């Protein structure tokens, strides 16, 4: 498994690679959200059913517009999300018709976050698009908190490990339904 800095990882992701990378709280697994083969590989590595859906993480909201149908949200709903970003808040928003079922699972919505983590922002800026994001662990296990855990659990299963530090968060992000305002998961 290659161990690289965020600026060196773009080609691996765009060629269908699955990576592990530090986020605000834990290591994440990620891939290109426009590559179903890469998404299926990520799901297989994590042993996660596609029906559950995944999160997209971005450096800014503009990167999410290819996936989120903002026309189904009011100005107030969008402003609430914008008031929390960048930061540890994930919003479930309506999807555009062309979004892969492997991203949204069995839902008509997708979970999205604008990250405050410098490494995640650098990855997304280098890609000029969001990154699939899910915690780096097998389904039901605790997420990885160190590069050593990634190397132990995922060597031979993923294509690269992005070097860097975890953020200051110690809890997963809060997940909020953007349409109803309902908190689906309390985090931070």
Curated annotation (Swiss-Prot):
It comes from the Bacteria. It is found in: Cytoplasm. The keyword Cytoplasm applies. One of its GO terms (cellular component) is cytoplasm. It catalyses: L-threonine + hydrogencarbonate + ATP = L-threonylcarbamoyladenylate + diphosphate + H2O. One of its GO terms (molecular function) is L-threonylcarbamoyladenylate synthase. InterPro entries: DHBP_synth_RibB-like_a/b_dom, Sua5-like_dom, TC-AMP_synthase, TC-AMP_synthase_SUA5. Keywords: ATP-binding, Cytoplasm, Nucleotide-binding, Nucleotidyltransferase, Transferase, tRNA processing. Its main location: cytoplasm. Required for the formation of a threonylcarbamoyl group on adenosine at position 37 (t(6)A37) in tRNAs that read codons beginning with adenine. Catalyzes the conversion of L-threonine, HCO(3)(-)/CO(2) and ATP to give threonylcarbamoyl-AMP (TC-AMP) as the acyladenylate intermediate, with the release of diphosphate. This is Threonylcarbamoyl-AMP synthase. It comes from Shewanella baltica (strain OS195). The lineage of its organism: Bacteria, Pseudomonadati, Pseudomonadota, Gammaproteobacteria, Alteromonadales. The gene is tsaC.
């Amino acid at each position: 498994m290659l161990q690289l800095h965020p600026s060196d990882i773009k080609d691996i992701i765009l060629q269908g690679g699955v990576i592990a990378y530090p986020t605000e709280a834990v290591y994440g697994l990620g891939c290109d959200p426009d590559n179903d083969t890469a998404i299926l590989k990520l799901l297989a590595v994590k042993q996660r059913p596609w029906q559950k859906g995944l999160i997209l993480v971005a450096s800014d909201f503009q990167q999410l517009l290819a996936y989120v149908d903002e026309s189904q949200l009011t100005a107030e709903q969008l402003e609430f999300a914008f008031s929390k970003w960048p930061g540890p808040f994930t919003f479930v928003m309506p999807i555009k018709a062309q979004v892969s079922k492997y991203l949204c699972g069995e839902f008509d919505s997708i979970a999205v976050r604008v990250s405050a983590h410098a490494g995640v922002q650098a990855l997304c800026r280098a890609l000029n698009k969001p990154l699939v994001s899910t915690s780096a662990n097998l389904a039901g296990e605790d997420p990885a908190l160190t590069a050593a855990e990634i190397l132990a659990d995922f060597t031979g299963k993923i294509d690269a490990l992005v070097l860097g530090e975890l953020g200051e968060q110690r809890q997963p992000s809060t997940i909020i339904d953007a349409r109803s305002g309902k908190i689906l998961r309390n985090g931070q």
